Amino acid sequence: MFSFYFNDNKITKLLMVGYGSTGKSVCDFLANFIDITVDISQNDDEFVNYDLNSYDLITVSPGIPLNKSPYRALTKFKDKIVSDIDIFYQYIKDTKAKTIAVTGSNGKSTVVTMTDFVLKDLGYKSILVGNIGTPALNKIGEKFDYCVVEVSSFQINLFNCVRFDLGCIINVSPDHLDRYQNFEQYKQSKLNLAKFSNDFFVYDVHNGIKYAGEYQIIRGAIYRNSTKLLDIVETKLFGEHNLENIIVVLNILDRLGLDINQAIDSIKKFKGLEHRCKIVKKVNGTTYINDSKGTNVGATIAALNSITNSKNIILLLGGVAKGGDFSLMIKSLDKYVKYVYIYGADKEYIESYIKGYCKYQLCNNMKQAFELASQKANSNEIVLLSPACASFDEFSGYAQRGEVFQNLVAQLEQKS
């Protein structure tokens, strides 16, 4: 066994703040080294008992709110703070593997998953890590040609020395305003990814930054210069937002020097993400769509704008709002939504934004919202779960919320 070094400095004492999946991956990795003491702070009361000056390094889980007491104290030790991705980078930087980082408010999970899928379909060894669910250090022993990393603004705030071969920002809209002073601060946290990337681009249709290389969207298809490359109907996806996601993937592959025509064939096979605008079933003429991964206002707006051309959506909305500005969805609600059922911890907060702009009802929980929606829905209408909120008031995560929705649809079908 060997001692643990970071930036050529021997580390003998490390504090781990937070012990979720990321913290556990760091702890498991460090178990391979000798001569290092690791202390773990799992809650506020434990944290205040540690002398931060006494540690060589401090790893912080992305879920730790650095803007709130007692964790504000960490801001004085920025040079000591490292993320799990910094540690991962230290141990792969001398290999030939290429690293790609993608951040954004909406679309990043689809982009990284599609990129990883295409790379594998083209015959490369690719790993997909980061905010999407698999901590980078869990893959440290694998051999790979490409490492695709989904990064959140919280993770970027913790970066120390990582250098990605390519960084990309897509579609930044207000989110996590419970962790940032305002939207500008949140947006800047995303843009900071450029500081840790050798090559970098932004594709943000919401803020008018449409770097697209030679690509453009015309009547539901992607063109390169004047040549049509791909029509949305040739894919297993739907909606203009997915054409935008594909353009980002094509730009990533372009910058990696890969064959775009071969990539197009791979993209046609990509089935999309679970819990992201997935049609569950049609029951009694009503289509039920699971977009549980829509955890902020921007994501729900994208779903509303892509699913239909009629005012035939019954929307299930609610959970933990994270300070979101629900007034931004009023235009889409007016155009596409027949009725809204609002549920969850912040239902009154959401109501304060949309009251007077649409028909709605407050519900106790998602199950009640579903039951009322299924009773109201007529043939050729859509019941859409796109909550625009986090789920942890009622569920363990967006995946469980989506699974519960799917089970409710299955139960409804059995009764029909």
Swiss-Prot record:
One of its GO terms (molecular function) is ATP binding. Keywords: ATP-binding, Cell cycle, Cell division, Cell shape, Cell wall biogenesis/degradation, Cytoplasm, Ligase, Nucleotide-binding, Peptidoglycan synthesis. It catalyses: UDP-N-acetyl-alpha-D-muramoyl-L-alanine + D-glutamate + ATP = UDP-N-acetyl-alpha-D-muramoyl-L-alanyl-D-glutamate + ADP + phosphate + H(+). Its main location: cytoplasm. Pathway: Cell wall biogenesis; peptidoglycan biosynthesis. ATP binds at residues 104-110. It is found in: Cytoplasm. Pfam families: Mur_ligase_C, Mur_ligase_M. One of its GO terms (biological process) is regulation of cell shape. It comes from the Bacteria. InterPro entries: Mur-like_cat_sf, Mur_ligase_C, Mur_ligase_C_dom_sf, Mur_ligase_cen, MurD. The keyword Lyase does not apply. It is an enzyme of class 6 (ligase). Its EC number is 6.3.2.9. GO terms for cellular component: cytoplasm. HAMAP family: MurD. Cell wall formation. Catalyzes the addition of glutamate to the nucleotide precursor UDP-N-acetylmuramoyl-L-alanine (UMA). Belongs to the MurCDEF family. This is UDP-N-acetylmuramoylalanine--D-glutamate ligase. It comes from Francisella tularensis subsp. holarctica (strain LVS). The lineage of its organism: Bacteria, Pseudomonadati, Pseudomonadota, Gammaproteobacteria, Thiotrichales.
